[in-house]
Protein backbone atom coordinates (compact mmCIF):
# COMPACT_ATOMS: atom_id res chain seq x y z
CA UNK A 1 0.00 0.00 0.00
CA UNK A 2 2.84 2.41 0.83
CA UNK A 3 4.53 1.82 -2.52
CA UNK A 4 1.36 2.70 -4.41
CA UNK A 5 0.81 5.99 -2.48
CA UNK A 6 4.37 7.45 -2.52
CA UNK A 7 4.48 8.25 -6.25
CA UNK A 8 1.10 10.03 -5.95
CA UNK A 9 2.35 12.30 -3.13
CA UNK A 10 5.49 13.05 -5.06
CA UNK A 11 3.55 14.02 -8.15
CA UNK A 12 1.31 16.41 -6.15
CA UNK A 13 4.37 18.13 -4.70
CA UNK A 14 5.83 18.54 -8.14
CA UNK A 15 2.58 20.00 -9.41
CA UNK A 16 2.57 22.60 -6.58
CA UNK A 17 6.20 23.52 -7.27
CA UNK A 18 5.50 23.80 -10.98
CA UNK A 19 2.51 26.05 -10.24
CA UNK A 20 4.56 28.32 -7.99
CA UNK A 21 7.36 28.56 -10.50
CA UNK A 22 4.91 29.41 -13.28
CA UNK A 23 3.43 32.21 -11.15
CA UNK A 24 6.86 33.73 -10.47
CA UNK A 25 7.86 33.76 -14.12
CA UNK A 26 8.57 37.22 -15.53
CA UNK A 27 5.63 38.70 -17.46
CA UNK A 28 5.83 38.68 -21.20
CA UNK A 29 7.07 42.05 -22.44
CA UNK A 30 6.39 43.47 -25.89
CA UNK A 31 9.23 43.38 -28.35
CA UNK A 32 11.64 46.32 -28.08
CA UNK A 33 11.01 48.07 -31.37
CA UNK A 34 10.84 51.69 -32.49
CA UNK A 35 7.10 51.34 -33.12
CA UNK A 36 6.41 50.02 -29.61
CA UNK A 37 8.52 52.78 -28.03
CA UNK A 38 6.56 55.41 -29.97
CA UNK A 39 3.28 53.81 -28.86
CA UNK A 40 4.43 53.89 -25.24
CA UNK A 41 5.29 57.59 -25.53
CA UNK A 42 1.92 58.36 -27.13
CA UNK A 43 0.05 56.38 -24.47
CA UNK A 44 2.01 58.16 -21.75
CA UNK A 45 1.15 61.58 -23.14
CA UNK A 46 -2.51 60.63 -23.45
CA UNK A 47 -2.47 59.38 -19.86
CA UNK A 48 -1.05 62.71 -18.67
CA UNK A 49 -4.17 64.37 -20.08
CA UNK A 50 -6.81 61.71 -19.47
CA UNK A 51 -5.87 59.37 -16.60
CA UNK A 52 -6.78 60.64 -13.09
CA UNK A 53 -3.98 58.41 -11.76
CA UNK A 54 -1.51 60.86 -13.32
CA UNK A 55 -2.82 63.76 -11.24
CA UNK A 56 -0.11 62.96 -8.69
CA UNK A 57 2.40 63.92 -11.39
CA UNK A 58 0.47 66.75 -13.02
CA UNK A 59 -0.46 68.74 -9.88
CA UNK A 60 3.10 69.35 -8.57
CA UNK A 61 4.17 70.35 -12.09
CA UNK A 62 1.31 72.86 -12.36
CA UNK A 63 2.08 74.40 -8.96
CA UNK A 64 5.78 74.80 -9.79
CA UNK A 65 4.87 76.10 -13.26
CA UNK A 66 2.60 78.75 -11.73
CA UNK A 67 5.29 79.92 -9.34
CA UNK A 68 7.90 80.19 -12.11
CA UNK A 69 5.46 81.82 -14.54
CA UNK A 70 4.59 84.50 -11.97
CA UNK A 71 8.26 85.33 -11.50
CA UNK A 72 8.84 85.51 -15.27
CA UNK A 73 5.85 87.80 -15.78
CA UNK A 74 6.87 90.09 -12.92
CA UNK A 75 10.41 90.36 -14.31
CA UNK A 76 9.47 90.92 -17.95
CA UNK A 77 6.01 92.53 -18.16
CA UNK A 78 5.45 96.13 -17.13
CA UNK A 79 3.26 96.65 -14.07
CA UNK A 80 -0.05 98.39 -14.81
CA UNK A 81 -1.27 100.93 -12.27
CA UNK A 82 -5.05 100.87 -11.89
CA UNK A 83 -6.20 101.01 -8.26
CA UNK A 84 -3.24 100.01 -6.09
CA UNK A 85 -2.00 103.59 -5.68
CA UNK A 86 -5.50 104.60 -4.59
CA UNK A 87 -5.56 101.73 -2.10
CA UNK A 88 -2.30 103.00 -0.60
CA UNK A 89 -3.64 106.56 -0.40
CA UNK A 90 -6.70 105.28 1.45
CA UNK A 91 -4.51 103.27 3.82
CA UNK A 92 -2.35 106.33 4.52
CA UNK A 93 -5.46 108.28 5.57
CA UNK A 94 -6.55 105.46 7.89
CA UNK A 95 -3.05 105.17 9.36
CA UNK A 96 -3.20 108.90 10.07
CA UNK A 97 -6.31 108.31 12.18
CA UNK A 98 -9.21 108.89 9.78
CA UNK A 99 -12.21 106.68 10.66
CA UNK A 100 -14.93 108.39 8.62
CA UNK A 101 -15.50 106.11 5.61
CA UNK A 102 -17.13 108.99 3.72
CA UNK A 103 -13.84 110.93 3.81
CA UNK A 104 -11.39 108.11 3.03
CA UNK A 105 -10.53 108.30 -0.67
CA UNK A 106 -7.78 108.22 -3.29
CA UNK A 107 -7.17 109.30 -6.87
CA UNK A 108 -9.72 106.89 -8.40
CA UNK A 109 -12.42 107.20 -5.76
CA UNK A 110 -13.56 106.61 -2.17
CA UNK A 111 -13.00 103.45 -0.19
CA UNK A 112 -15.77 100.90 -0.87
CA UNK A 113 -14.45 97.73 0.79
CA UNK A 114 -14.83 96.41 4.38
CA UNK A 115 -12.19 96.35 7.09
CA UNK A 116 -10.61 93.05 6.00
CA UNK A 117 -9.42 94.85 2.88
CA UNK A 118 -7.98 97.60 5.07
CA UNK A 119 -5.99 95.17 7.21
CA UNK A 120 -4.52 93.31 4.22
CA UNK A 121 -3.46 96.45 2.42
CA UNK A 122 -2.08 97.97 5.62
CA UNK A 123 0.19 94.94 5.78
CA UNK A 124 1.11 95.34 2.09
CA UNK A 125 1.82 99.03 2.70
CA UNK A 126 4.14 98.18 5.58
CA UNK A 127 5.83 95.47 3.53
CA UNK A 128 6.44 97.72 0.52
CA UNK A 129 7.44 101.00 2.20
CA UNK A 130 4.08 102.64 1.71
CA UNK A 131 3.42 100.99 -1.64
CA UNK A 132 6.62 102.28 -3.25
CA UNK A 133 8.27 98.87 -3.66
CA UNK A 134 5.84 97.40 -6.22
CA UNK A 135 7.94 94.27 -7.04
CA UNK A 136 7.61 93.15 -3.41
CA UNK A 137 3.82 93.44 -3.60
CA UNK A 138 3.84 91.63 -6.95
CA UNK A 139 5.80 88.79 -5.35
CA UNK A 140 3.15 88.50 -2.62
CA UNK A 141 0.44 88.25 -5.25
CA UNK A 142 2.52 85.72 -7.18
CA UNK A 143 2.73 83.49 -4.12
CA UNK A 144 -0.98 84.06 -3.50
CA UNK A 145 -1.72 82.92 -7.04
CA UNK A 146 0.43 79.82 -6.56
CA UNK A 147 -1.28 79.04 -3.25
CA UNK A 148 -4.71 79.42 -4.87
CA UNK A 149 -3.73 77.02 -7.65
CA UNK A 150 -2.53 74.49 -5.06
CA UNK A 151 -5.74 74.77 -3.01
CA UNK A 152 -7.85 74.51 -6.16
CA UNK A 153 -6.03 71.34 -7.19
CA UNK A 154 -6.75 69.94 -3.72
CA UNK A 155 -10.48 70.63 -4.11
CA UNK A 156 -10.43 68.81 -7.45
CA UNK A 157 -8.43 65.92 -5.97
CA UNK A 158 -11.06 65.29 -3.29
CA UNK A 159 -13.60 64.75 -6.07
CA UNK A 160 -11.50 61.78 -7.14
CA UNK A 161 -12.14 61.22 -10.83
CA UNK A 162 -11.28 64.59 -12.40
CA UNK A 163 -9.03 64.11 -15.42
CA UNK A 164 -5.69 65.97 -15.63
CA UNK A 165 -6.73 68.21 -18.53
CA UNK A 166 -9.18 69.98 -16.21
CA UNK A 167 -6.34 70.73 -13.79
CA UNK A 168 -4.29 72.15 -16.64
CA UNK A 169 -6.99 74.67 -17.49
CA UNK A 170 -6.61 76.14 -13.99
CA UNK A 171 -3.30 77.71 -15.05
CA UNK A 172 -4.26 78.44 -18.66
CA UNK A 173 -5.64 81.96 -18.26
CA UNK A 174 -3.49 84.89 -19.34
CA UNK A 175 -6.04 87.38 -17.99
CA UNK A 176 -6.03 85.71 -14.57
CA UNK A 177 -2.25 85.92 -14.32
CA UNK A 178 -2.49 89.62 -15.18
CA UNK A 179 -5.14 90.22 -12.50
CA UNK A 180 -2.85 88.77 -9.85
CA UNK A 181 0.68 89.98 -10.52
CA UNK A 182 0.12 93.03 -12.76
CA UNK A 183 -3.03 94.57 -11.23
CA UNK A 184 -2.87 93.66 -7.49
CA UNK A 185 -6.63 93.59 -6.87
CA UNK A 186 -8.14 92.62 -3.52
CA UNK A 187 -10.44 90.13 -5.31
CA UNK A 188 -7.50 87.70 -5.29
CA UNK A 189 -7.46 87.44 -1.50
CA UNK A 190 -11.21 86.83 -1.38
CA UNK A 191 -10.83 84.05 -3.94
CA UNK A 192 -8.09 82.33 -1.93
CA UNK A 193 -10.31 82.41 1.16
CA UNK A 194 -13.27 80.94 -0.74
CA UNK A 195 -11.21 78.10 -2.20
CA UNK A 196 -10.06 77.42 1.35
CA UNK A 197 -13.66 77.39 2.61
CA UNK A 198 -14.62 74.88 -0.07
CA UNK A 199 -11.66 72.65 0.74
CA UNK A 200 -12.37 72.64 4.50
CA UNK A 201 -16.01 71.66 3.94
CA UNK A 202 -15.02 68.98 1.42
CA UNK A 203 -12.62 67.54 3.99
CA UNK A 204 -15.39 67.55 6.61
CA UNK A 205 -17.60 65.59 4.22
CA UNK A 206 -14.85 63.15 3.20
CA UNK A 207 -13.99 62.27 6.81
CA UNK A 208 -17.52 62.69 8.15
CA UNK A 209 -17.81 59.11 9.46
CA UNK A 210 -14.24 59.04 10.77
CA UNK A 211 -14.12 62.37 12.61
CA UNK A 212 -17.52 62.27 14.26
CA UNK A 213 -20.08 65.04 14.62
CA UNK A 214 -18.08 67.19 17.07
CA UNK A 215 -14.94 67.51 14.95
CA UNK A 216 -17.01 68.01 11.79
CA UNK A 217 -18.86 70.84 13.55
CA UNK A 218 -15.52 72.41 14.50
CA UNK A 219 -14.47 72.27 10.84
CA UNK A 220 -17.65 74.12 9.86
CA UNK A 221 -16.71 76.81 12.40
CA UNK A 222 -13.26 77.08 10.80
CA UNK A 223 -14.95 77.42 7.40
CA UNK A 224 -17.27 80.09 8.83
CA UNK A 225 -14.29 82.06 10.13
CA UNK A 226 -12.56 81.89 6.75
CA UNK A 227 -15.75 82.73 4.88
CA UNK A 228 -16.44 85.77 7.02
CA UNK A 229 -12.89 86.99 6.38
CA UNK A 230 -13.52 86.61 2.65
CA UNK A 231 -16.62 88.81 2.94
CA UNK A 232 -14.64 91.37 4.94
CA UNK A 233 -12.22 91.71 2.01
CA UNK A 234 -14.82 92.03 -0.74
CA UNK A 235 -18.56 91.46 -0.79
CA UNK A 236 -18.60 89.27 -3.91
CA UNK A 237 -18.08 86.35 -1.50
CA UNK A 238 -21.76 86.76 -0.59
CA UNK A 239 -22.59 85.04 -3.89
CA UNK A 240 -21.51 81.80 -2.18
CA UNK A 241 -23.84 82.32 0.78
CA UNK A 242 -26.67 79.96 -0.34
CA UNK A 243 -24.18 77.17 -1.02
CA UNK A 244 -22.38 77.75 2.26
CA UNK A 245 -25.56 77.63 4.36
CA UNK A 246 -26.87 74.52 2.58
CA UNK A 247 -23.62 72.57 2.86
CA UNK A 248 -23.01 73.57 6.49
CA UNK A 249 -26.60 72.67 7.42
CA UNK A 250 -26.12 69.13 6.14
CA UNK A 251 -22.64 68.76 7.66
CA UNK A 252 -24.18 69.85 10.98
CA UNK A 253 -26.55 66.88 10.53
CA UNK A 254 -29.49 69.20 9.81
CA UNK A 255 -29.27 70.66 13.31
CA UNK A 256 -30.59 74.22 13.07
CA UNK A 257 -28.99 75.20 16.40
CA UNK A 258 -25.53 74.28 15.11
CA UNK A 259 -26.20 76.24 11.92
CA UNK A 260 -27.14 79.29 13.99
CA UNK A 261 -23.88 78.90 15.93
CA UNK A 262 -21.96 78.90 12.65
CA UNK A 263 -23.75 82.09 11.55
CA UNK A 264 -22.97 83.68 14.92
CA UNK A 265 -19.26 82.99 14.41
CA UNK A 266 -19.44 84.76 11.04
CA UNK A 267 -21.03 87.81 12.65
CA UNK A 268 -18.44 87.87 15.45
CA UNK A 269 -15.61 87.72 12.92
CA UNK A 270 -17.09 90.73 11.10
CA UNK A 271 -17.27 92.61 14.38
CA UNK A 272 -13.68 91.77 15.31
CA UNK A 273 -12.30 92.63 11.86
CA UNK A 274 -14.23 95.90 11.72
CA UNK A 275 -13.78 96.78 15.41
CA UNK A 276 -11.81 99.93 14.60
CA UNK A 277 -14.66 101.38 12.52
CA UNK A 278 -17.63 99.90 14.37
CA UNK A 279 -16.57 101.45 17.70
CA UNK A 280 -18.49 98.76 19.56
CA UNK A 281 -17.75 100.17 23.02
CA UNK A 282 -18.92 103.70 22.19
CA UNK A 283 -22.51 104.88 21.84
CA UNK A 284 -22.34 108.64 21.49
CA UNK A 285 -23.55 110.53 18.43
CA UNK A 286 -20.15 110.61 16.70
CA UNK A 287 -19.61 106.89 17.22
CA UNK A 288 -23.05 106.10 15.82
CA UNK A 289 -22.31 108.26 12.77
CA UNK A 290 -18.94 106.58 12.10
CA UNK A 291 -20.45 103.14 12.60
CA UNK A 292 -23.33 103.73 10.19
CA UNK A 293 -21.05 105.36 7.63
CA UNK A 294 -18.77 102.31 7.69
CA UNK A 295 -21.65 99.87 7.23
CA UNK A 296 -23.25 101.91 4.45
CA UNK A 297 -20.03 102.46 2.49
CA UNK A 298 -18.35 99.08 3.04
CA UNK A 299 -21.51 97.05 2.39
CA UNK A 300 -23.19 99.19 -0.26
CA UNK A 301 -25.60 97.04 -2.29
CA UNK A 302 -26.73 99.98 -4.44
CA UNK A 303 -23.43 100.80 -6.11
CA UNK A 304 -23.71 101.82 -9.75
CA UNK A 305 -21.41 100.45 -12.45
CA UNK A 306 -19.95 102.23 -15.46
CA UNK A 307 -21.02 100.93 -18.86
CA UNK A 308 -17.52 101.43 -20.29
CA UNK A 309 -16.08 98.70 -18.03
CA UNK A 310 -18.74 96.01 -18.41
CA UNK A 311 -17.53 92.70 -19.81
CA UNK A 312 -20.83 90.81 -19.84
CA UNK A 313 -23.60 93.27 -20.81
CA UNK A 314 -22.07 95.22 -23.71
CA UNK A 315 -24.84 93.96 -25.99
CA UNK A 316 -27.41 95.71 -23.79
CA UNK A 317 -28.05 99.39 -24.70
CA UNK A 318 -26.42 101.78 -22.22
CA UNK A 319 -29.66 103.50 -21.24
CA UNK A 320 -31.17 100.12 -20.32
CA UNK A 321 -27.95 98.94 -18.61
CA UNK A 322 -28.01 101.91 -16.22
CA UNK A 323 -31.74 101.64 -15.47
CA UNK A 324 -33.32 100.29 -12.28
CA UNK A 325 -35.52 98.07 -14.42
CA UNK A 326 -32.51 96.12 -15.69
CA UNK A 327 -31.07 95.81 -12.17
CA UNK A 328 -34.37 94.47 -10.83
CA UNK A 329 -34.71 92.10 -13.79
CA UNK A 330 -31.28 90.60 -13.07
CA UNK A 331 -32.11 90.27 -9.38
CA UNK A 332 -35.35 88.41 -10.12
CA UNK A 333 -33.56 86.13 -12.58
CA UNK A 334 -30.78 85.45 -10.06
CA UNK A 335 -33.22 84.47 -7.32
CA UNK A 336 -35.37 82.39 -9.70
CA UNK A 337 -32.48 80.38 -11.15
CA UNK A 338 -31.03 79.86 -7.68
CA UNK A 339 -34.35 78.57 -6.32
CA UNK A 340 -34.64 76.26 -9.33
CA UNK A 341 -31.22 74.73 -8.62
CA UNK A 342 -31.97 74.46 -4.89
CA UNK A 343 -35.27 72.63 -5.38
CA UNK A 344 -34.30 70.44 -8.33
CA UNK A 345 -30.72 69.59 -7.32
CA UNK A 346 -29.40 70.73 -3.92
CA UNK A 347 -32.55 69.60 -2.06
CA UNK A 348 -33.41 66.71 -4.37
CA UNK A 349 -34.66 63.65 -2.50
CA UNK A 350 -32.04 61.61 -4.36
CA UNK A 351 -29.40 63.69 -2.59
CA UNK A 352 -30.94 64.46 0.81
CA UNK A 353 -32.61 61.07 1.25
CA UNK A 354 -35.97 62.67 2.06
CA UNK A 355 -38.71 64.65 0.37
CA UNK A 356 -38.61 68.44 0.25
CA UNK A 357 -41.63 68.65 2.57
CA UNK A 358 -39.96 66.40 5.15
CA UNK A 359 -36.72 68.36 4.81
CA UNK A 360 -38.52 71.63 5.57
CA UNK A 361 -40.40 70.13 8.53
CA UNK A 362 -37.19 68.67 9.97
CA UNK A 363 -35.58 72.10 9.75
CA UNK A 364 -37.69 73.26 12.70
CA UNK A 365 -36.51 70.43 14.94
CA UNK A 366 -33.63 71.40 17.30
CA UNK A 367 -31.73 68.14 16.93
CA UNK A 368 -29.99 66.00 14.30
CA UNK A 369 -32.42 64.89 11.58
CA UNK A 370 -30.11 63.99 8.69
CA UNK A 371 -30.90 60.86 6.67
CA UNK A 372 -28.26 58.14 6.56
CA UNK A 373 -28.45 58.22 2.75
CA UNK A 374 -27.70 61.96 2.46
CA UNK A 375 -25.03 62.28 -0.24
CA UNK A 376 -23.53 65.48 1.15
CA UNK A 377 -21.99 63.41 3.95
CA UNK A 378 -21.10 60.48 1.71
CA UNK A 379 -17.34 59.94 1.47
CA UNK A 380 -17.43 59.22 -2.26
CA UNK A 381 -20.04 61.70 -3.50
CA UNK A 382 -19.98 64.39 -0.79
CA UNK A 383 -16.82 66.30 -1.79
CA UNK A 384 -17.98 66.40 -5.41
CA UNK A 385 -21.44 67.64 -4.42
CA UNK A 386 -19.96 70.37 -2.25
CA UNK A 387 -17.70 71.62 -5.05
CA UNK A 388 -20.63 71.46 -7.49
CA UNK A 389 -22.89 73.36 -5.11
CA UNK A 390 -20.35 76.12 -4.54
CA UNK A 391 -19.35 76.33 -8.21
CA UNK A 392 -22.88 76.46 -9.64
CA UNK A 393 -24.17 78.89 -7.00
CA UNK A 394 -21.31 81.30 -7.61
CA UNK A 395 -21.53 81.00 -11.40
CA UNK A 396 -25.25 81.76 -11.29
CA UNK A 397 -24.40 84.92 -9.37
CA UNK A 398 -21.64 85.83 -11.83
CA UNK A 399 -23.85 85.20 -14.85
CA UNK A 400 -26.64 87.42 -13.53
CA UNK A 401 -24.51 90.03 -11.79
CA UNK A 402 -25.14 93.73 -12.36
CA UNK A 403 -21.86 93.98 -14.26
CA UNK A 404 -18.55 92.16 -14.57
CA UNK A 405 -15.31 94.13 -14.59
CA UNK A 406 -12.09 92.54 -15.79
CA UNK A 407 -10.76 91.67 -12.34
CA UNK A 408 -13.99 89.81 -11.57
CA UNK A 409 -12.73 86.83 -13.59
CA UNK A 410 -10.89 85.82 -10.42
CA UNK A 411 -14.26 85.29 -8.74
CA UNK A 412 -15.02 82.09 -10.63
CA UNK A 413 -12.09 81.17 -12.88
CA UNK A 414 -10.86 78.64 -10.31
CA UNK A 415 -13.95 76.41 -10.63
CA UNK A 416 -14.72 76.96 -14.32
CA UNK A 417 -12.50 74.00 -15.43
CA UNK A 418 -14.40 71.73 -13.03
CA UNK A 419 -17.75 72.86 -14.43
CA UNK A 420 -16.50 72.24 -17.98
CA UNK A 421 -15.35 68.78 -16.91
CA UNK A 422 -18.75 68.15 -15.33
CA UNK A 423 -20.53 68.91 -18.61
CA UNK A 424 -19.18 65.68 -20.07
CA UNK A 425 -18.13 67.44 -23.27
CA UNK A 426 -14.63 65.98 -23.10
CA UNK A 427 -11.24 67.70 -23.37
CA UNK A 428 -11.51 68.91 -26.97
CA UNK A 429 -14.87 70.70 -26.76
CA UNK A 430 -14.20 71.86 -23.19
CA UNK A 431 -10.78 73.17 -24.20
CA UNK A 432 -12.33 75.04 -27.11
CA UNK A 433 -14.97 76.51 -24.79
CA UNK A 434 -12.24 77.60 -22.39
CA UNK A 435 -10.29 79.25 -25.20
CA UNK A 436 -13.33 81.20 -26.41
CA UNK A 437 -14.17 82.11 -22.80
CA UNK A 438 -10.63 83.41 -22.36
CA UNK A 439 -10.93 85.42 -25.58
CA UNK A 440 -14.02 87.12 -24.18
CA UNK A 441 -12.02 88.27 -21.16
CA UNK A 442 -8.99 89.32 -23.21
CA UNK A 443 -11.07 91.49 -25.54
CA UNK A 444 -10.61 95.10 -24.42
CA UNK A 445 -12.80 97.00 -24.52
CA UNK A 446 -15.53 94.38 -24.61
CA UNK A 447 -17.72 94.19 -27.70
CA UNK A 448 -21.29 93.17 -28.36
CA UNK A 449 -19.99 89.85 -29.68
CA UNK A 450 -17.59 89.11 -26.80
CA UNK A 451 -20.14 89.86 -24.08
CA UNK A 452 -22.90 87.89 -25.80
CA UNK A 453 -20.60 84.89 -26.24
CA UNK A 454 -19.51 85.08 -22.59
CA UNK A 455 -23.10 85.03 -21.34
CA UNK A 456 -23.90 82.17 -23.74
CA UNK A 457 -20.95 80.04 -22.57
CA UNK A 458 -21.80 80.50 -18.89
CA UNK A 459 -25.50 79.79 -19.49
CA UNK A 460 -24.85 76.71 -21.62
CA UNK A 461 -22.30 75.35 -19.12
CA UNK A 462 -24.67 75.74 -16.17
CA UNK A 463 -27.57 74.16 -18.06
CA UNK A 464 -25.48 71.16 -19.10
CA UNK A 465 -24.07 70.61 -15.61
CA UNK A 466 -27.60 70.73 -14.19
CA UNK A 467 -28.88 68.27 -16.81
CA UNK A 468 -26.24 65.57 -16.15
CA UNK A 469 -27.78 63.63 -13.29
CA UNK A 470 -24.66 61.55 -12.67
CA UNK A 471 -22.89 64.73 -11.56
CA UNK A 472 -25.26 65.04 -8.65
CA UNK A 473 -26.39 61.52 -7.79
CA UNK A 474 -23.34 59.46 -8.73
CA UNK A 475 -23.16 56.71 -11.30
UniProtKB/Swiss-Prot annotation:
Bias type Basic and acidic residues, positions: 1-13
Bilayer disposition of the protein: Multi-pass membrane protein
Main location (coarse class): endoplasmic reticulum
InterPro entries referenced in this protein's UniProt entry, alphabetically: Glycosyltransferase_ALG3 (IPR007873)
Pfam family, one: ALG3
Catalysis: reaction(s): an alpha-D-Man-(1->2)-alpha-D-Man-(1->2)-alpha-D-Man-(1->3)-[alpha-D-Man-(1->6)]-beta-D-Man-(1->4)-beta-D-GlcNAc-(1->4)-alpha-D-GlcNAc-diphospho-di-trans,poly-cis-dolichol + a di-trans,poly-cis-dolichyl beta-D-mannosyl phosphate = an alpha-D-Man-(1->2)-alpha-D-Man-(1->2)-alpha-D-Man-(1->3)-[alpha-D-Man-(1->3)-alpha-D-Man-(1->6)]-beta-D-Man-(1->4)-beta-D-GlcNAc-(1->4)-alpha-D-GlcNAc-diphospho-di-trans,poly-cis-dolichol + a di-trans,poly-cis-dolichyl phosphate + H(+)
Pathway: Protein modification; protein glycosylation
UniProt EC number: 2.4.1.258
UniProt function note: Dol-P-Man:Man(5)GlcNAc(2)-PP-Dol alpha-1,3-mannosyltransferase that operates in the biosynthetic pathway of dolichol-linked oligosaccharides, the glycan precursors employed in protein asparagine (N)-glycosylation. The assembly of dolichol-linked oligosaccharides begins on the cytosolic side of the endoplasmic reticulum membrane and finishes in its lumen. The sequential addition of sugars to dolichol pyrophosphate produces dolichol-linked oligosaccharides containing fourteen sugars, including two GlcNAcs, nine mannoses and three glucoses.
Protein name, per record: Dol-P-Man:Man(5)GlcNAc(2)-PP-Dol alpha-1,3-mannosyltransferase
Organism: Meyerozyma guilliermondii (strain ATCC 6260 / CBS 566 / DSM 6381 / JCM 1539 / NBRC 10279 / NRRL Y-324)
Amino acid sequence: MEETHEPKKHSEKEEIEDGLSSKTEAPHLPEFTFKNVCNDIINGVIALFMDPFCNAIVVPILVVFTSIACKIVIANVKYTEIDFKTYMQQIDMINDGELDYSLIAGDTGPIVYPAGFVQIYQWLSWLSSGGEDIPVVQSVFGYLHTLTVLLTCCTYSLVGDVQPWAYMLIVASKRLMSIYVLRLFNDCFTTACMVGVTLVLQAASYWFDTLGSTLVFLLTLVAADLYSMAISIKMNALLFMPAFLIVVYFLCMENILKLLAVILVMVLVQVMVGWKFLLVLFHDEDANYLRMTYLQRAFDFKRSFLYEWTVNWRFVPEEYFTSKLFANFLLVCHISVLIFFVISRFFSSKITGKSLVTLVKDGFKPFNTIASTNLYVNKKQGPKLILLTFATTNTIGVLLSRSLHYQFLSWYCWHMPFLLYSTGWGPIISGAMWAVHEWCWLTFPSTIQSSAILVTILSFTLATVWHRGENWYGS
